[in-house]
Curated annotation (Swiss-Prot):
The chain crosses the membrane at residues 26-48. This is ATP synthase subunit b 1. Belongs to the ATPase B chain family. It comes from Picosynechococcus sp. (strain ATCC 27264 / PCC 7002 / PR-6). NCBIfam families: ATP_synt_b, PRK07352.1.
Length: 175
């Protein structure tokens, strides 16, 4: 009935307040709001507390993950620095080893060259000695051939007999 009177007064062109407590259901509304406040506040409080706990747990979890990520990043950076230092050391060791190997190879090469030179000089000396010996033999043969030819032309049989007898006497075979 309150709505009808409201519409009736609104149709008459005025606005007025209805102060009849029973007609406006203020008591019913107060009871419902009170019940909702008493029981709803506990329910909503529990929901809000649960939500708050979940948010706090999520924040703590996020902070823990961020802390772990930071620790992992720090460890990875340290590992990277160590790896870079080790790589630099390996590079330096490789340079030293390469230089040592180079010097060893050069030394071996010089030794081989010296051996080859010595071998060549020795072979040359040997060949030179062979050639000199061959020349001496050839000169001796030519000289003997010339002496024989001259002896045949200059010596007759009596001179040859005297020469043979004298040679035998010199050798100690003469009586």
């Amino acid at each position: 009935m309150g709505i009808i009177s409201y519409l009736a007064t609104a149709s008459e062109g005025g606005f007025h307040l209805n102060f009849d407590i029973l007609e406006t259901n203020i008591i019913n509304l107060a009871i419902i709001i009170g019940v909702l406040y008493v029981y709803g506040s506990k329910f909503i409080g529990n929901i809000l507390e649960t939500r708050k706990s979940k948010i706090v747990a999520d924040l703590e979890d996020a902070e823990n993950r961020a802390k772990k990520a930071q620790e992992a990043l720090t460890k990875a950076q340290k590992d990277l620095e160590q790896a870079q230092a080790q790589a630099a050391k390996i590079r330096e060791d490789a340079k030293v080893a390469a230089e040592k190997t180079k010097q060893d190879i050069l030394a071996k090469g010089r030794d081989e060259v010296e051996k080859l030179k010595a071998s060549a000089v020795k072979e040359l000396s040997t060949e030179q000695a062979k050639v000199i010996t061959e020349l001496k033999r050839r000169v001796a043969e030519l000289a003997l051939a010339k002496v024989e030819a001259q002896l045949r032309s200059d010596l007759d049989e009596s001179a040859q007999a005297k020469l043979v007898d004298r040679s035998i006497a010199q050798l100690g075979g003469g009586a």
